[in-house]
Amino acid sequence: MKHLYIKTFGCQMNSYDSTRMADLLGESHAFQSTDDPEKADLIILNTCHIREKAEDKLFSELGRLRPLAERGVILAVGGCVGQAEGRTIFSRAPYVRMVFGPQNYHKLPQMIQRALDGETRVIAEDIPSVDKFDNLPQVRAQGVVGQVTVQEGCDKFCAFCVVPYTRGREWSRPVAAILAETEALAQQGVREVLLLGQNVNAYAGVDEEGVSYDLALLIRRVALIEGIERIRFVTSHPVDMNEDLVEVFGEIEQLAPYLHLPIQSGSDAILAAMQRGHTVEEYCTWVEKVRAVCPDVALASDFIVGFPGETEQDFQATLDLISRLGFDHAYSFKYSSRPGTPAADMPEQVDEAEKSRRLERLQQLLNTQQLQRNKARVGRRESVLVEGVSKKRDGELSGRSGTLRTVNFAGPVALIGQFVDVEIVEGLPNSLRGRLV
């Protein structure tokens, strides 16, 4: 029996891609997944290219895996670094046998066979016109929460971002394919589905009768699938928000009260330099509209500090925005220059020490805010999807609420996979504790 080890870097779409690679190679070459690279015959590193740090992690990991490659394990680099760097990876790590981009993993069976036949450098770095999803086996559930890619790529070309170059232009899967995949997951016990896209609210699909669907209509259709009791979607762009999407937050019971809507900066000047296409007030208006129909919605955002030209006043505007709106979840980063993007050549680059100082201040505010908002949940009753045994305490279970908060509580393992009501008794920095009601 051959074993496959996949290590995933970066976004949730990469996580989805990794599960589909495992499905594909299990069917084509009978690979069985393992969590131990020492036992693997094939190792795939599914990579992220958004930040330089992620790329550095890749080559550090390749160095650690080199002894395994030298004893015959096939080492492959997939994902966005594979797309962006291509043959350069072979130069920096000549023991790597395969390189492929995120739009090419449906070719893995043929690539693996070429490597098994002795080819030492197998590469697929084009962005093909063929729909890769048509060449994948039926999805296999990995638990009670499932992921379904509905949209890929990006047409926004933000000044800092490589996604349009590594994932390609915006493209939406057909409605029928999405529904079929979601139904298959539901039949395997999935109760919550996460609809994925680089710009998921730019979804523009068509059903078998030629009817056009936006994300709001797609959510309404997914909500009709038997067994699917909770729906989320990530990641959205403020430019693609619309009134129909706001309405579903107030009308579709299965839609989780959670909105990941990255703003990146609280300064209009920096948003313009980033080529984001919207202002701070336009962003706030959409947040207010969603909160009007769904008051309990959890707001999540990404923030970048130290973008070229960011002054102390610009940075303070970001802190002010955070204080004004209140964020339940946030992902914050120092600006990382990516080759080929407009921001890489901009003047007034902020030095690393200042970036670090700003990031620390930003995270302190976000952490304080998150703890306050978690403590405010005490005494509330939450519907929690039980995902497994808690890693915090023996005898406890762990799940997530509709607002994507981790909730730990005492209960029997028979509850795993079910929705249960939990009263929150303690708010912690990154989670909640509760008791079964």
From Swiss-Prot:
TRAM domain ranges (all copies): 375-437
- The protein here is known as tRNA-2-methylthio-N(6)-dimethylallyladenosine synthase
Please give the Gene Ontology molecular function terms for this protein. 4 iron, 4 sulfur cluster binding; metal ion binding; N6-isopentenyladenosine methylthiotransferase activity
Q: List residues of the Radical SAM core domain.
A: 140-372
Matching entries from PANTHER family are given as: CDK5 REGULATORY SUBUNIT-ASSOCIATED PROTEIN 1, MITOCHONDRIAL TRNA METHYLTHIOTRANSFERASE CDK5RAP1
What PROSITE patterns does the record tag this protein with?
MTTASE_N, MTTASE_RADICAL, RADICAL_SAM, TRAM
Give the cofactor note text: Binds 2 [4Fe-4S] clusters. One cluster is coordinated with 3 cysteines and an exchangeable S-adenosyl-L-methionine.
Q: Where's the MTTase N-terminal domain?
A: 2-117
Q: Which UniProt keywords apply?
A: 4Fe-4S, Cytoplasm, Iron, Iron-sulfur, Metal-binding, S-adenosyl-L-methionine, Transferase, tRNA processing
Q: Where in the cell is it found?
A: Cytoplasm
One Pfam family assigned to this protein is Radical_SAM
**One GO cellular component, as annotated:** cytosol
Give the species this sequence originates from. Answer: Magnetococcus marinus (strain ATCC BAA-1437 / JCM 17883 / MC-1)
The gene that this protein is the product of is: miaB
> What is the documented function of this protein?
Catalyzes the methylthiolation of N6-(dimethylallyl)adenosine (i(6)A), leading to the formation of 2-methylthio-N6-(dimethylallyl)adenosine (ms(2)i(6)A) at position 37 in tRNAs that read codons beginning with uridine.
Q: Provide the cofactor list for this protein.
A: [4Fe-4S] cluster
EC nos: 2.8.4.3
What is the protein's quaternary organization? Monomer.
